[in-house]
UniProtKB/Swiss-Prot annotation:
The keyword Metal-binding applies. NCBIfam families: glmM, PRK10887.1. HAMAP family: GlmM_B. This is Phosphoglucosamine mutase. The gene is glmM. The keyword Magnesium applies. GO terms for biological process: carbohydrate metabolic process; peptidoglycan biosynthetic process; UDP-N-acetylglucosamine biosynthetic process. It comes from the Bacteria. Mg(2+) binds at S101, D242, D244, D246. Pfam families: PGM_PMM_I (PF02878), PGM_PMM_II (PF02879), PGM_PMM_III (PF02880), PGM_PMM_IV (PF00408). GO terms for cellular component: cytosol. It comes from Methylobacterium radiotolerans (strain ATCC 27329 / DSM 1819 / JCM 2831 / NBRC 15690 / NCIMB 10815 / 0-1). It is an enzyme of class 5 (isomerase).
């Protein structure tokens, strides 16, 4: 299915380039029409992160939704998982998050959630795409049937309480010194407050958004500042969220980064011991390290792999009854609690394990030695470099060289014009060589 607007995580691109007020208006109208089912008054909740362009896109979306008769509840800056949760809690027909996640401030995006709090499937996105470019003039509501917009003031308190309730009442964070990096993004208020209310000594960074500094040298894609602060303040743990707080990485007390694969390993082992896993396994993507698969195998658990994107992980979880899944990048999905990746909730579940075991984070969180894994990105302007004969030949040769000693994954990004080339295996030299071979071929084809 060819997509014009939607990628693997909603619609995303440069603000006032791809993501224009005109497009946001049309998305609001199209999505509003698709989700006006039944004869009740329809409503949509809209949240955003802290990008400057969020104001522009929010206003255009409001115009679009209200013009087709939908009421709008404005949440302001909140994490993506808060939008998913509040869509269900407030009985909305649709939820919208304005964010480009871990991308720089120049980008923005529009993510859509259904009334059940789950991201939309491909079929519904295709239906919306079909209406975006349609003539809306005859579909607009009459003057007496326009929607209203209202700002909701209690959003942060609701989400904080929701996050806290994912822990047993007897679990506190007393005695823990926690550094939390909010990436100058959507969780800049709720994450420190939640940790403090649970009893932690909280040191917060990345909590001064100005519209331009989201993800800039902070957050889960730039953990250096968090590592330095953990070491400087002798903290027990560091928590790095991204711009919309749907992903998380951990830094242990020694300043070592713990990625999503290790987090899934920790939780899977704990939940297996507590008989909380609904299936004997975990769902991850093709990018997760082979070391995770081997570790889980040693526990008698399987690793099911999907295409890259937390939506595909979640779709597989729902279809096959899993309650734990995620991505190496830090999207951790715990479907007992959430309908999407939730960085704060994932961090709280890890902290619960740390408190129960009463051991340093470095001893709890490094469950396996990851195999050498090399990932390189090749940017291209247009065309389909992966279809070039020279690239196909290079990929086939690289796979032959790896044989059964590793994996090679080549894929286009779903959010930017980039080809990602990843290989892993027991022999680092061989892994480097096959990645370089493919990268060189793609680079020449993309020139």
């Amino acid at each position: 299915m060819v997509r014009k607007y939607f990628g693997t995580d909603g619609i995303r691109g440069r603000a006032n380039g791809v993501i224009t007020p005109e497009l946001a208006l049309k998305v609001g109208q199209a999505a509003g029409l698709v989700f006006q089912r039944g004869d009740h008054r329809h409503r949509v909740v809209i949240g955003k992160d802290t990008r400057l362009s969020g104001y522009m896109i929010e206003t255009a979306l409001v115009a679009g939704f209200t013009s087709v008769g939908m009421d709008v509840l404005l949440l302001g800056p909140v994490p993506t998982p808060a939008v998913a949760m509040l869509t269900r809690s407030m009985r909305a027909d649709l939820g919208v998050m304005i964010s480009a996640s871990h991308n720089p401030f120049e980008d923005n995006g529009i993510k859509l959630f259904g009334p059940d709090g789950f991201k939309l499937n491909d079929a519904i996105e295709h239906e919306i795409e079909g209406l975006i470019d349609a003539d809306m003039h005859k579909r607009l509501s009459g003057s007496n049937d326009l929607g209203r917009a209202k700002r909701i003031e209690s959003v942060h308190a609701r989400y904080i309480e929701f996050a806290k309730r994912t822990l047993p009442r007897q679990v506190t964070l007393d005695g823990l010194r926690v550094v939390v990096d909010c990436a100058n993004g959507a969780a800049y208020r709720v994450a420190p407050e939640t940790l403090w209310e649970l009893g932690a000594e909280v040191i917060a960074i990345g909590t001064e958004p100005d519209g331009f500094n989201i993800n800039r040298d902070v957050g889960s894609t730039a953990p250096a500042a968090l590592i330095d602060m953990v070491r400087e303040r002798r903290a027990d743990i560091g928590i790095a969220l991204d711009g919309d707080a749907d992903r998380v990485l951990i830094v242990d007390e020694k300043g070592q980064v713990v990625d999503g694969d290790q987090l899934m390993a920790v939780v899977a082992r704990s939940w297996k011991e507590d008989e909380r896993l609904t299936q004997p396994g975990v769902v991850a993507t093709i990018m997760s390290n082979l070391g995770l698969e081997r570790f889980l195998g040693g526990l008698g658990l399987s690793l099911a792999r999907t295409a890259v994107g937390d939506r595909y992980v979640l779709e597989h979880m729902r279809a096959h009854g899993y309650n734990l899944g995620g991505e190496q990048s830090g999207h951790i999905i715990m479907s007992d609690y959430t309908t999407t990746g939730d960085g704060l909730v994932a961090a709280l579940q890890l902290l619960s394990v740390v408190q129960r075991q009463n051991r340093p984070v470095s001893e709890v969180c490094h469950c396996f030695d990851p195999l050498p894994q090399i990932l390189k990105n090749v940017r291209y302007r247009s065309g389909e470099p992966l279809r070039e004969d020279s690239v196909v030949s290079a990929i086939e040769h690289a796979r032959e060289r790896l044989g059964n000693a590793g994996r090679l994954v080549i894929r286009p990004s779903g959010t930017e014009p980039v080809i990602r080339v990843m290989a892993e295996g027991d022999d680092r030299g061989l892994v480097n060589a096959v990645v370089d071979e493919v990268v060189d071929a793609v680079t020449r084809a993309a020139a």
